[in-house]
Amino acid sequence: MKNNSILLVTIAFLAGIISGCGAKISAPSKGMSSEEYESLIRLDPQNTMMANFSAVKGMDGYFLIDNQGESTISVVDYNKGETIKKIKLSDPPGTSFKPAGNHHIFVIPGGRYAWSSQRYEKDVMWTIDLTTHEVVDTFRLSMGGKTIKAPLHIGFAYKSPLAVTGNILDKKNGYLTFLRTDTRRPSHIVELSCAGARDAMFTFDDSKVFTTCQQEPKGVSIVDVKQKKEIKWFSIEGGRAGGMTPDGKYFMVGASKAVVLIDTATNEIAKTIKVPGGGGNFTCLPDGSKCYAGLRKDNSVGVIDMASLELIKVIKTGKNGNRLYLNPANTRYGIFTNESGKSETVSVIDTQADVKIIDLETGLKPHNVAFNPEGTRAIISTPKEPVATLVDTSAADPSKWEVITTDIDSGIENNGVRWVPSPYAIKSAMNRFDSKDNQFIQIAASE
């Protein structure tokens, strides 16, 4: 039950300002200055850096699960351990696409709205109002004679109201669609030399976008944002997943038996690191000292020392090792997903000792993980079943983390998961933020 008390998170907000991470909850609007845009809170940790979960500690919230196979998004109350609502999605009138395909939730800077991206061979995306948990816009990305297929992952710019997504299922064309976060609609498309763009990310000054391409010829394309054109591309054998280091110095590529580091200043390959397996996703420690690469065929995670740019350890985990997700309240520990369709485990990793502590049993094919800001709960999607897994991660000793249930009501092909503030918390925060110059943000708390 909510109470009406107000939690002053002045320290967290000031920390956000000092670190360059925004803490203001609001929607991007036309005419915003760069300073105003940078003041918006970032709550999406996937293809964008600088997520600021410390600013929302103590805030009431929910987990959202994108149910790719049934056109719904589950709203999960992790305190009750149950789904309290399913948001219904539909395609635009007059279309005849295969239903659903809603793959992943991406929280737009400001925490007021979110997008649901697309995994099927179509160009439809949805805008979710996080104050009502309803779809407020359904739109298509194709334009100017260019057909977009499967805009899977979304990266957000840092200083300007832009976002970018690819087209992973197009085997002939490579396209990046740029969207505006102030209108929440697509802006323009840039053509690439490699097909099936996947993980697109902005440099921290918003001048360039680096993206991997999943189809042949696999590789990396670099786009000049202002000129709206590709300026370079590399062919990289087995190139698939992409990620940015916390300092923005390198764009990392998960390739065939290699991790390729591209210098974002020079646009040149800085280092190719040999690894067993390869092709998985990346997570780096917040201080940038180490990065962790999923090594799919090796059933492991590789530890890369970013000072020496060398592989320093391989930790055996489970079948089809994909990605490490760090607990935001204590980034020493994280959950690593073993994504095989026959896998029913995730591995808890100690990033200080670089060892596996325990395995936790989940549903089939654990794919994506999200923690609440306090680090006491984690949701794990399991696409091979119509349910998700909820984990108690409150123990200081991660060997005591426990599965609460593997039966959170979701849907078949449940994939992307995110933590979002509750509607009550968002409205309270927006109402009590006095002005852009006010360094005190009052956030609604609940017990």
Which ranges hold each PLM region?
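Bacterial N-terminal signal peptides that target proteins for export
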Residues: 1-8
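Bacterial N-terminal signal peptides
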Residues: 9-17
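Predominantly soluble domains enriched in secretory-pathway, periplasmic, or organellar proteins
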Residues: 20-447
